[in-house]
Amino acid sequence: MPSLKDLRNRIASVKATQKITKAMQMVAAAKLRRAQEAAEAARPYAERMDAVLANVSASISGADAPPLMAGTGKDDVHLVVVCTADRGLAGSFNSQIARLAREHIRKLQANGRQVKIITVGKKGYDLLRRDFGKLVIDRIELREVKQIGFANADAIAKKVIGLFEAGEFDVCTLIYSRFKSVISQIPTEQQIIPAAVPQAEGESTGAIYEYEPDAGAILADLIPRNIAVQIFRALLENAAGEMGAKMTAMDNATRNAGEMINKLTITYNRQRQAQITKELIEIISGAEAL
């Protein structure tokens, strides 16, 4: 049984930890608001970009489609870009993304496909290196970036497109966590090469559009930008999801610390009461002996 001194030290230690988790919860809450606003602001742009691509791509035939949309015509080598956080203390946020990545990679391998991996975020590599360390061809960390910008996503997109143009892979899939709410983040996989151009919505108005330069040249310029936009959106969604998961995890940790403090305090009071009672009995017994 721990002594009263040990219990006092444990209570003080847990209280110090509780202060830290509470502070981290408040910081995550402040960052969450900014990250959520950025993620929600990026969605309309990404959706509008899809609509523009759908309209332009509808006017060209498959033979005229740029390579990033037409693909290589093969399905042998797959590049998987796994986006996670650079830091932990976010509950199951990173492990859920890694779980989806493992399932996707193993499914490809079971079908005889060769897999290459790029990890964006330190935790992604840490979680995947045991099973797929030899498949990782590049590691990208953004821990020094205070606020994710389009330039970060554009650099990743250029790296991926460069690998495609060098014949390093046939299909590229992006895996990240889509932000739904503070307590809900959805691991998502999205094919970005060959670019999955959505069908144009709505009924045809009969209008005839002329593109200058031709539609193929416009697509050749738009698709690389769209790949960067989709990666940027994934990074923003990830950032919002990470802050939401971290805020929830720190809130739970703060609550658990409070419960532990209460239990330790009760134990401390009981032992102190027992010790006082024992001392009183000893004093009374001594007085009676006299």
From Swiss-Prot:
Database matches in InterPro entries: ATP_synth_F1_ATPase_gsu, ATP_synth_F1_gsu, ATP_synth_F1_gsu_CS
Annotated coiled-coil segments of the chain: none
Keywords, in A-Z order: ATP synthesis, Cell inner membrane, Cell membrane, CF(1), Hydrogen ion transport, Ion transport, Membrane, Transport
Superkingdom per UniProt: Bacteria
Lipid bilayer topology: Peripheral membrane protein
One GO CC term, this protein: plasma membrane
Pfam families, per the entry: ATP-synt (PF00231)
Reported function: Produces ATP from ADP in the presence of a proton gradient across the membrane. The gamma chain is believed to be important in regulating ATPase activity and the flow of protons through the CF(0) complex.
Assembly, per entry: F-type ATPases have 2 components, CF(1) - the catalytic core - and CF(0) - the membrane proton channel. CF(1) has five subunits: alpha(3), beta(3), gamma(1), delta(1), epsilon(1). CF(0) has three main subunits: a, b and c.
Family listed: Belongs to the ATPase gamma chain family.
Record NCBIfam families: ATPsyn_F1gamma, PRK05621.1-4
Protein name per UniProt: ATP synthase gamma chain
Gene: atpG
